[in-house]
Amino acid sequence: MEILDLENEELLGVFFEEAQNLVDILEENIMSLEDDPNNSDTIDEIFRAAHTLKGSSASLDMMELSDFTHIVEDVFDAIRDGKVNINNDLVDLLLSSLDVIKEMLALRIDGKVYLNDISDLKSKLKQFLVIDDQTFIKRFDGNSIKNNFCLSESDLEEIREGLGIGQKVLRISVVFNSNSNSEVENSGLKIFNILKNLGSVLHTIPKYEQIIEDKFLKRVDYYLIYSDIEGVKKSLDSLNLIESYLVDEFNVKEELKKLADEEIKDVDLDSNFVLNDNFDFTEDEISDLLLEVENQKLFKVRLDFVKDNPMATISGLQMLQALKSLGKIFKSIPDSSELLADKFFDFVIYYLISNTSEESIAKKINLPDVVSHFEIKNVNLESLKSVRLKEDDEAPFKENKNIKKNSPISVNLIRIDSKKIDYILNLVSEAVISKSSYNQINSEMITLFYNFNYFYDYQESFQRNFLIDLKIVFKDAGLTLEDEIESHINSLMSFKMEKALKDISELRNSFFRLLQNFKMTSGRLSRIITDLHESVLKTRMLPISNIFSRFTRVVRDLSKKLNKIVNLKMEGEETELDKSVIDDLVDPLMHCVRNSMDHGLETVEERVKRGKSKAGTIILRAKNEGNVISIEIEDDGIGIDPKVIRRKLIEKGTIKEDAIYSDFELINLIFAPGFSTAVQVTDLSGRGVGLDVVKKSIEKLNGTILVESEIGLGTIFKIKLPLTLVIIQGLLVKSGSETYVIPLNNVLETHRITEHDIKLLENYHEVYNLRDEVISVLRLDKLFNITRDDSLIEKFLIVVNTSNMKIAIVVDSILGEEDFVVKPIKDKFSSSAGIVGATTLGNGKVVLIIDVFKLFDLQKDTKE
């Protein structure tokens, strides 16, 4: 029985999602330390996030990420212990370190490894970890190796967290020879590596980072998970680099009690959990197991998991992957498919087939931030032959509802509010009930059908045998058919037909009631399905705070770079957008914010001269407007001068000198390709790329972007986006023999027209006069090469908005307004101009959805 291969995608996907969440926590809290450097809660939260990221990445063999995060963690440990003070320079250094962590994660997501040299950055971080050597040596003076180093509470906690059930900690205090032999230079690291091969080194004094710095240390204390004191002594006795050493058992609980005034709750060391000898196998599994084990050993490994670990929902998968490196996982409880679910399990039992030792397994699973307790049992294979599965031994694996699930921004995973899931499940339950109603109705309709068949057969038989029956009746009565035939026939037919009409009436009434019930049930099921569909779509919705929160760091860094003081305000962060829109909105908003920082806001000196406050303000604002989301990026800067825009456009040849444009139209020409008013090129602006890309990106999302500005007061970028790209409201239109959908959020108005209402200019360009406004006319039959229906006297004109202008689309008829589920077009049709996707109608017909922003491009191509 082979357990599912869970390597890679499922586990890594959840890890990257959680890792991104941890990075966001780190970034947000590190920046908050600038304003409140002594906030212990913030420092603790940063330390926990770094500690978790370090441990989780190590368990997945991402050592470049784990090792570097370990250094960052140690810096915060020093901050937490009051050994390091926070200032702006340290915050800058920590944020730079966080950028490296982000790069490491990004490369791992792409299947690559970070290889850049960051030794300078590591050295800067380690400057905060160095302990003065003289102080260190004086602490040892006294000629007695029993004069132990003082352990802080955080040191003891680190040791305590690393322990499993029944494990011992040995303290190995080593004094090194102080000769000048180069072999001794890194003697502390040599001993560390020797001890690491024996067990798990939980802690060292001084810390590991100082040990590896290639400087001579007189003494180092190592805290090792290992039970064989004599084995340790044997490994150290023959080493010339050691002057003396002492190995003794270290009682963590007693040391903690010395530091605390109250009794320490002994949750880790005195658990009442013990592995029993009952096995969780069926008879068939035992047979398979005995065949697979052969000359190997079977270990039963139980792991209890840390509940407050942000990555608690993948702990079971993490440990499964770790144990697989030692052998074959025959079975896990819960099984691998359950471990893939995004939920927390208090504990998991693994059955490992391997030739390894219990010590090796302990080293592999000893991750304090993941595992709170563990026990390893070497199973007696002979006992398996008589074991049967016992129902009372099955442990309840329940999801821990106290685990907090934060919304991530990263790989293609979505966290869903449990209330939304509960609502969906209720709707599904209603759908199941309605399905039962349908089954009942179906059964009744079948019965009714058989009744009709019986009635039909009866009437047919009656008509066929009527005369025969009549002759028999007459013969029995001693009558001749000719004498009384008319009266008897009338009497008999009257009786039969009266009964038949009564039966038909009852059947008709039954069928009518059935149809009424069917109609009511159909309506109820339709409502449930609609609600279910909408609820599923809501699970894709994420708050826009997922994007807005990123700009705190952006504004901070750019403020320093541009020597400006900027306050960032956010409004409507709870506004929700479809995840697919969220993912593609980051870059456009980034361009707009950078533009406001670089071009919009003045320097401190310029603002003071204009009578403004020294600090400029940027507001990120989001709000719902029906089926559309409105996003605004507002600044209180210098504003945009339409005269400057006009002059630049004339210089570039984009517009003619005699061209007439309103101020609003001129300002919105900043989205023209290659447009820039920057005097010099910098790494932020001046290259003429950016805002045209922003416009294209927004239009790709089926949205619009406009700019409003007033000289001296500021500028507002206004973006309108559909709530979701999955479902849209649209007009179903017909042109020739083809049917299309035009997104309703682009439609301004519709008109019924004749061909005489459309005018032709000298350049063969068709236009329509809409309340004294001349707008361009596009015909779908021309654009998509459809045979035109010239028999129609009247047609329809649909006026649509394309960001900064209106166009009119001519169609033969408007079939109606509906909601449409958008399906992407793949392969050779994916780049079709003028088409944004496809949808399926209720009758099964597939129709294309028009991309109104690309229709002009399609018309140019058609003319050429």
Swiss-Prot record:
Its main location: cytoplasm. Residues 1-108 form the HPt domain. One of its GO terms (molecular function) is phosphorelay sensor kinase activity. InterPro entries: Bact_Chemotaxis_CheA, CheA-like_dim, CheA-like_homodim_sf, CheA-like_P2_sf, CheA_P2-bd, CheW-like_dom_sf, CheW-lke_dom, CheY-binding_CheA. Keywords: ATP-binding, Chemotaxis, Cytoplasm, Kinase, Nucleotide-binding, Phosphoprotein, Transferase, Two-component regulatory system. It catalyses: ATP + protein L-histidine = ADP + protein N-phospho-L-histidine. GO terms for biological process: chemotaxis. It comes from the Bacteria. Involved in the transmission of sensory signals from the chemoreceptors to the flagellar motors. CheA is autophosphorylated; it can transfer its phosphate group to either CheB or CheY. PANTHER family: CHEMOTAXIS PROTEIN CHEA, SENSOR HISTIDINE KINASE CHEA. This is Chemotaxis protein CheA. The lineage of its organism: Bacteria, Pseudomonadati, Spirochaetota, Spirochaetia, Spirochaetales. The gene is cheA.
